[in-house]
Amino acid sequence: TATDSTTDLKFTNGAYWDLKGNSSVSDLTVGKGSVINMTADSSRYSNLQVDNLTATDGTFVMNAGSVDGGGSYSDKLVIDKTSAAGTNTIKLISTGGMEAAARNQAVLVKGAAADTKFAVSDSVYANGLYEFDLTLADKENNGKYDWFIGSLQKNTVDSVNTMVSANQVAYTAWIDGNGTLRQRLGELQSGADNGVWARMFGGKLGGDEFTNKYKTYQLGYDAQAGDWRVGAAYEYSDGSLNYTSGSGENKIGAVSLYGTLQGKDNSILDIVVKRGRIYGDVDVYGKYSDQGDYSTDATSIGVEYSKRFDGGNNVYFEPQAQLTFGRIDGYDYISNKGVKVAYDDLNSFIGRLGIVAGKAFSRGDVYVKASLLHEFSGNSSVTMLAANGESYSADKDYGDTWLEAGIGGNITLGKNCELYGDVERSFGGDVTKNWGANVGFRYSF
């Protein structure tokens, strides 16, 4: 370590110098594999002033970023007299402010000869939201050359991409729980008695940045109230997430109220109102590791209408239409690295047109189904602010169109018991349901 004026210094065979503060050297030799570390004093930028430089295949490690009190944006190597031919590497370290350093063309080397060259060795990550790819440029100044940050390209790091994807996870998990009347209650019989029911459904959702394997448990009770069947249900969902560079969990607890009106013309109107809370966590691995936990409230209101037509020989057809409005309230959290993450409210409006074709038997039925769904809304925005001042914002549009298809059935186990279920998958959306399965049991009394 050196801090004061020194006459001659020679570093060869991988030698290492920790430079703290400013230093002046008459003759400095930096051989192959040797390192001059100018970042040992992290509280300020350092200047290394050299009369004569002889350097080939050496490395200069420098701080760069936000401006200091003296107007500097980086450490600096200043050559007062001569420099020998050679190519060397500059490795930049930053705790933030790289865009300001590039915008102000921070000078890293001043006074080099024309055949003394420098290049940046690696991209720069300042423990924030971006990784910066830099190139150096030189400009002639009174017969000598100054080397400065010439261009900068920034790329969001994995932690940003993963935390953005977490909002899409919350959205897809919430809308997947909407379901249909047939999935919730099976083949509901007109004039049936009061009943309790339970079902379990799960599946695997996949997008560009994540997969979500989930299972949901739902328990409900309903009773006849005039022409309407009214009921309530509670559900709990647990999802295990894999991101491109991380993992996480997603949980939902929700209460729903519903009313179902069965017409004498084989039509059914079903209205469901649901309110719940979404919980999640994100763990990002590797170089850009970070962790965050979040929670928010969500609401949905769904209206479904269907009507059954007799096709003869116990075959039936059932066109369906469904509209579901959903809202995920805005939320924010601070990650372990001090990144402030904030999501705006997300509104959803999904329309579904479907058809069920089935065949009834003495103790139940089997059917195939297909639906076309479209998200008419699904807009959201996210902002992030890192502890080092780097910021990120993006608007996300989850508007999409997709198909769902499946098979299912109902079976009567006794006078008061019914078992029902289905399997399905989706096609064509940005997020697909690779598979989904639903099984339920209803007891009437």
Mark where each language-model region is:
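Outer membrane beta-barrel transmembrane domains
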Residues: 256-261, 343-445
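Outer-membrane beta-barrel architecture
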Residues: 59, 191-198, 227-231, 266-272, ...
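Outer-membrane translocation/initiation segment of Type V secreted surface proteins
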Residues: 56, 61-67, 71-73, 89-226, ...
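Outer membrane beta-barrel translocator domains of Type V secretion systems
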Residues: 153-317, 424, 429
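Transmembrane beta-barrel domains of outer membrane proteins
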Residues: 16, 182, 186-187, 213, ...
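Solvent-exposed, glycine/polar-rich loop segments of beta-barrel outer-membrane systems
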Residues: 159, 213, 240, 244-246, ...
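Extracellular beta-strand/loop-rich repeat segments of large surface/secreted proteins
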Residues: 1-106, 110
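Short glycine-rich beta-strand segments
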Residues: 200-205, 235-237, 274-280, 320-332, ...
